């Protein structure tokens, strides 16, 4: 036995013979300190269960039209707005391919060798192999048994994971051993925890007893997850926790006697985080979704939903994806609603099918049991106010410049809304070819059979068939600084009406052929803006962009024509430079109009950012427009249209202004106006204010608009943020909607409480309470208000937990 002093050069000991160790285990090599990492990562997954399968709310939104399915067999990732649920960390660092040939390095203040059989290390003892390290006050390594035994301030590290305890024993190559009373830290997540003991059974299996995990500071853990025992199997990528409890400020808020969880990103069956909230129509609302991973391309989510004012609702969503097809089926059913004493239900079917190259079929069917269903059960304002659900199926074909659509489209319309026309069927074809010898050519042909249910008063509106063909040809001439585009369009339409009992004398056949000629032109001038540049200290370029648009269409009386899908467009920039002020194909306005517009912009010369835009436009009608949406004017008047003006200003950092006005020079009054201002000095600081005004007109809508709204997100303290919105209708003297809430960001968790009240379509106001706690690096519980906050507070940014800053050198070994 010889004694050696610490040498400036580390000594490399021969590796033990591989004997009967499997090749796979030999390739893994090294110390099993890395096994601690999936252990604690598993703890981070316990509360979320099969977290990777679903996002946001588990309750489906039975919307009118929705994309069917993400084009990937893998479950969709959690959206950014859901916050940091269970962290998706990389797997432990790749092991050296050296395997059993990897050298073992030792270092200490004093080393005592045993005839090449082993070594005893004292004082800053360290053993390193294949990326892992064991350190301690004293360490003994037996080369024959390949066993390392460490005592006193033992530290095991690998791939950013550090475990500290009083004692550890490991068979290095076999990855067998234990560590007593370990405290562990994770550089990637900032998480930490402790256990009574960790046993490493082999390279894949380990057991932790009385283990805990938190991303809070170990000295001040607001929350932590604990379990009596956790069994991990890295080969099967599954873990089982026994007696798991989530504690928040010392209070248990979630628990389970035993459950399994995944150790990687693969989907696995299990419970998803519960959703909780309160609504004035539903009472206390609790949903506990359960995810079933049927196959890589199929899954099922079952979501029982308990509402104290309604009862127990059962819902489900089935998703599938195959070669050339995908879709989802969703349904929910509430037997014997406590308030209505009736069964309430909703379902949705979406399917996409590829039939051949360029040929696809689709199905989109949505229905609810009654008119009040969206008001009573949907969680969002947009879904609560939805009054029309689509039932549609069709076939599409795309080939080069040609597209074709054949579909049947029906609607379920909820009262008090009136029914819409249904297309049973519609056949539509389009051909679009650009730069055909310098010409742009477009041809659209359509056949539609229109049907409509009786109105609420029992009136039968006109029904019939419509066929049209609309070819157009244009010749764009584009040069540097200017363009001219002449265009000719023909609209040929044929109607075959059904005799209606309400209007037996109405003519049944109509036809119309009308040409439209237009000429669009514009120029762009640029110059430097030295005065503005000196004022703001930035080099600016100013543009001046005049535009002239002329359109001519002869008059044709269309007062007897039906209105299947046509409405009057709102007067604005999109309409004033268009060939037809009506959307749809049932009205073609007579035109002899010239529109002039002028736009000026200020653009940063170095960055190209537009800081200012001002636009003004007006149209002159040489003869007056006789064709109206509901008839024909006998004596139209020539003259100028309303004057349109708008501006967008972002000249000062953090300040934004958008404003527009529609001014009638004849009556000297404003028919429409809006202004919106926003102050955003920095992240999570925003104040918005807006005002809208519209004078009622017989052309568009007799409903006046006179509304203002304010919204804001602003810090109250260093960690607390207030969110609010208020919208009021001055014309009706009533509140439109209001929202108030508080977000609190601690080191390792975020809390949100939000109250929303809005006017629904039928029975006054609806109020909802959202309460959510988000545990950094673990999961979140409660109802998610983030989408509502983004929708109602422009510029809103979710707060996130503010952990103590760390670096890659923290816990560095």
Curated annotation (Swiss-Prot):
Ribonucleoprotein as UniProt keyword: no
InterPro entries: LipoPS_assembly_LptD, LptD, LptD_C
Location in or out of the cell: Cell outer membrane
Cross-referenced Pfam families: LptD (PF04453)
Keywords of the record: Cell outer membrane, Membrane, Signal
Cellular component, GO, one term: cell outer membrane
Superkingdom, taxonomy of origin: Bacteria
Disulfide bonding pattern of the chain: none
TM segment ranges: none
Sequence segments annotated as region (Disordered): 1-29
Signal peptide residues on this chain, from the entry's feature table: 1-52
Chief location category: membrane
GO biological process assignments: Gram-negative-bacterium-type cell outer membrane assembly; lipopolysaccharide transport
Family as reported in the entry's similarity comment: Belongs to the LptD family.
Purpose: Together with LptE, is involved in the assembly of lipopolysaccharide (LPS) at the surface of the outer membrane.
PANTHER family reported for this sequence: LPS-ASSEMBLY PROTEIN (PTHR30189), LPS-ASSEMBLY PROTEIN LPTD (PTHR30189:SF1)
Oligomer status and interactors: Component of the lipopolysaccharide transport and assembly complex. Interacts with LptE and LptA.
Protein name: LPS-assembly protein LptD
Organism: Cupriavidus necator (strain ATCC 17699 / DSM 428 / KCTC 22496 / NCIMB 10442 / H16 / Stanier 337) (Ralstonia eutropha)
Gene: lptD
């Amino acid at each position: 036995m010889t004694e050696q002093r610490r040498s400036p050069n580390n000594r490399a000991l021969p590796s033990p013979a591989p004997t009967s160790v499997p090749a796979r285990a030999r390739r893994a090599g090294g110390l099993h300190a890395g096994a601690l990492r999936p252990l604690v990562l598993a703890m981070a997954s316990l509360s979320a269960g099969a977290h990777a399968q679903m996002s946001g709310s588990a309750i489906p939104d039975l919307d009118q039209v929705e994309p069917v399915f993400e084009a990937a067999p893998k479950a969709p990732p959690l959206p950014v707005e859901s916050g940091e649920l269970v962290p998706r960390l990389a797997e432990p660092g790749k092991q050296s391919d050296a395997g059993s040939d990897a050298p073992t390095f030792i270092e200490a203040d004093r080393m005592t060798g045993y005839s090449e059989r082993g070594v005893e290390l004292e004082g800053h003892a360290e053993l390193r192999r294949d990326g892992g390290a064991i350190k301690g006050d004293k360490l003994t390594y037996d080369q024959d048994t390949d066993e390392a035994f460490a005592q006193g301030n033992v530290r095991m590290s690998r791939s950013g994971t550090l475990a500290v305890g009083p004692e550890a024993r490991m068979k290095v190559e076999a990855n067998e051993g234990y560590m007593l009373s370990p405290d562990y830290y994770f550089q990637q997540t900032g998480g930490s925890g402790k256990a009574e003991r960790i046993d490493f059974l082999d390279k894949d299996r380990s057991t932790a007893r009385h283990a805990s995990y938190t991303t809070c500071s170990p000295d001040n853990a607001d929350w932590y997850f604990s379990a009596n025992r956790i069994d991990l199997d890295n080969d099967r990528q599954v873990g089982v926790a026994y007696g798991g409890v989530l504690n928040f400020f010392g209070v248990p808020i979630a628990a389970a006697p035993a459950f399994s969880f995944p150790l990687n990103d693969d989907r696995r069956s299990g419970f998803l985080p519960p959703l909780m909230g309160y609504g004035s129509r539903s009472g206390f609302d609790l949903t506990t979704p359960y995810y079933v991973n049927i196959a890589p391309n199929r899954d099922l989510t079952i979501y029982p939903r308990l509402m104290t004012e309604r009862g127990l609702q059962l819902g489900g969503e089935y998703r599938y994806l195959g070669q050339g097809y995908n879709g989802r089926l969703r349904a929910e059913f509430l037997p014997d609603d406590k308030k209505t004493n009736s069964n309430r239900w909703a379902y949705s079917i979406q399917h996409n099918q590829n039939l051949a190259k360029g040929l696809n079929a689709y199905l989109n069917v949505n229905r609810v049991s009654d008119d009040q269903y969206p008001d009573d059960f949907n969680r969002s304002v947009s879904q609560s106010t939805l009054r029309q659900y689509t039932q549609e199926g069709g076939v599409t074909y795309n080939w080069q410049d040609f597209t074709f659509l054949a579909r049947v489209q029906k609607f379920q319309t909820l009262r008090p809304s009136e029914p819409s026309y249904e297309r049973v069927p519609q056949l539509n074809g389009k051909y679009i070819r650009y730069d055909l010898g310098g010409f742009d050519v477009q041809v659209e042909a359509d056949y539609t059979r229109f049907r409509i249910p009786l109105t609420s008063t029992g009136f039968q509106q006109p029904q019939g068939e419509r066929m049209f063909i609309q070819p157009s040809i244009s010749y764009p001439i584009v040069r540097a600084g200017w363009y001219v585009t002449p265009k000719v369009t023909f609209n040929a339409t044929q109607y075959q009406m059904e005799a209606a009992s309400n209007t037996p004398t109405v003519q049944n056949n109509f036809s119309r052929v009308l040409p439209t000629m237009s000429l669009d032109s514009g120029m762009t001038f640029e110059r430097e803006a030295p005065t503005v540049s000196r004022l703001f200290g930035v080099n600016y370029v100013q543009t001046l962009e005049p535009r002239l648009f002329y359109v001519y269409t002869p008059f044709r009386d269309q007062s007897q024509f039906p209105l299947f899908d046509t409405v009057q467009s709102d007067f604005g920039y999109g309409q004033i430079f268009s060939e037809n002020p009506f959307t749809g194909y049932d009205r073609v306005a007579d035109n002899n109009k010239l529109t002039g517009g002028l736009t000026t912009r200020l653009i940063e010369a170095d960055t190209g950012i537009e800081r200012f835009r001002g636009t003004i436009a007006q149209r002159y009608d040489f003869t007056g427009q006789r064709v109206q949406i509901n008839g024909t004017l006998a004596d139209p008047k020539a003259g100028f249209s309303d004057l349109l003006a708008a501006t967008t200003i972002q000249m000062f950092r953090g300040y934004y202004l958008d404003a527009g006005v529609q001014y009638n020079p004849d009556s000297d009054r404003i028919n429409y106006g809006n202004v919106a201002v926003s102050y955003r000095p920095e992240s999570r600081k925003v104040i918005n204010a807006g005002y809208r005004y519209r004078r009622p007109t017989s052309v568009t809508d007799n409903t006046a608009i006179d509304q203002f709204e304010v919204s804001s997100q602003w810090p109250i303290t260093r960690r607390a943020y207030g969110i609010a919105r208020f919208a009021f209708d001055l014309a009706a003297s009533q509140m439109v909607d209001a929202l108030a809430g508080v977000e609190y960001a601690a080191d390792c968790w975020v809390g949100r409480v939000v109250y929303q009240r809005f006017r629904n379509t039928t029975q006054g106001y609806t109020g909802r309470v959202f309460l959510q706690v988000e545990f950094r690096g673990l999961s979140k519980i409660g109802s998610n208000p983030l989408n509502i906050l983004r929708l109602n507070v422009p510029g809103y940014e979710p707060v996130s937990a503010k952990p103590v800053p760390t670096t890659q050198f923290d816990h560095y070994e």
